[in-house]
Amino acid sequence: MIKVLIVEDSPVVRELLSHILHSDPQIRVVGVAESGEEALKEVVRLRPDLITMDVNLPRMDGFETTRRIMEEIPTPIIIVSAAWVSTEVEKTFRALEAGALAVLEKPSIAARDYDIRARDLIRAVKAMSEVKVIRRWSRSPRIEPAPPASGEPDIGKITKRFEVVAMGASTGGPTVLKQILSDLPDNFTIPILIVQHMTQGFIPGFVDWLSRAANYPVSVAVHGEEIRPGHAYVAPDGLHMGVNALGKIILTKGEPENGLCPSVSYLFRSVYRAYGENAVGVLLTGMGKDGAYELKVMKDCGMITIAQNKETSVVYGMPGEAIGMNAASYVLPPEKIARVLVKLAGSVAP
């Protein structure tokens, strides 16, 4: 039985979330909290397996509440937010940065896709309740040992020009992508194509959040747009993203792959067909296996492939699947991924 604490100041939304979660026999709502302060008390008293968190709470907002919980009693947290409210979107991504695992749009009984959102909530609660979260934001500073990782490529042996970097991520991906992009310099020359699994409606806010951290433009991909050096492009809601040999973005409403659209597998396959060995594939934290097999094909084509290491992955599903099939040339934490990409961008044959 999965024990859930609902943190939400709206009685109507609290009741709706409780109704949805109680419809599954494997889930039990053990408590509700109307404010951040109450949530902090209830999480200690009830010890839930998972928390659903609103971001707009009286006095202490969802970001600060998430930060405090991850500092004091780490617990899996799903942010349940309104995608159409810009202030909520901003707080949502700050909460992800503080340690929340995922974001879902608030369900509405009047919405046409109510049944889909209800199923998504139940599915997310079941999946995220199994994630082992770690303590964050310690009051007392301490020095953490660097996580183990394999060595970085010997850039001196690489003499080809890399035309594009393709990245895929799911659960835990937003903060990792933010770290990698913010660690790349403003003169980074390789275009980056990104697929991040995310609830529909949040991609524009996600891109805006990323662009404020990055040192170069980050935008939602547009069909037919030519990819440019020093730019990052994020796949939009509900469309597979690929690229052709002319360097133009191709968006298509195809069947889901691995149950997902956009799919990392689709992006990776498109990239190795268009660029062969002159591309880099990066598979980051995430649930499932999207992109793992295609990363193996990339490596077999002679491409540089990178998977995030287990120690820094929120969920080791996608990179773990890839590593298990020997699909990764290098297994690295996010900060080393950024350093390797910088070196690859400068590794052009004279």
UniProtKB/Swiss-Prot annotation:
Function: Involved in chemotaxis. Part of a chemotaxis signal transduction system that modulates chemotaxis in response to various stimuli. Catalyzes the demethylation of specific methylglutamate residues introduced into the chemoreceptors (methyl-accepting chemotaxis proteins or MCP) by CheR. Also mediates the irreversible deamidation of specific glutamine residues to glutamic acid.
Pfam families: CheB_methylest, Response_reg
Protein family: Belongs to the CheB family.
Residues annotated with 4-aspartylphosphate modification: 54
EC number(s) reported in the record: 3.1.1.61, 3.5.1.44
GO cellular component: cytoplasm
Post-translational modification note: Phosphorylated by CheA. Phosphorylation of the N-terminal regulatory domain activates the methylesterase activity.
Active site: residue positions: 170, 197, 290
Reactions catalysed: [protein]-L-glutamate 5-O-methyl ester + H2O = L-glutamyl-[protein] + methanol + H(+); L-glutaminyl-[protein] + H2O = L-glutamyl-[protein] + NH4(+)
InterPro entries noted in UniProt: CheB-like, CheB_C, CheY-like_superfamily, Sig_transdc_resp-reg_Me-estase, Sig_transdc_resp-reg_receiver
UniProt-recorded name of the protein: Protein-glutamate methylesterase/protein-glutamine glutaminase 1
Subcellular location: Cytoplasm
SMART domains: REC
UniProt KW keywords: Chemotaxis, Cytoplasm, Hydrolase, Phosphoprotein
Domain CheB-type methylesterase: 148-342
Notes on the domains: Contains a C-terminal catalytic domain, and an N-terminal region which modulates catalytic activity.
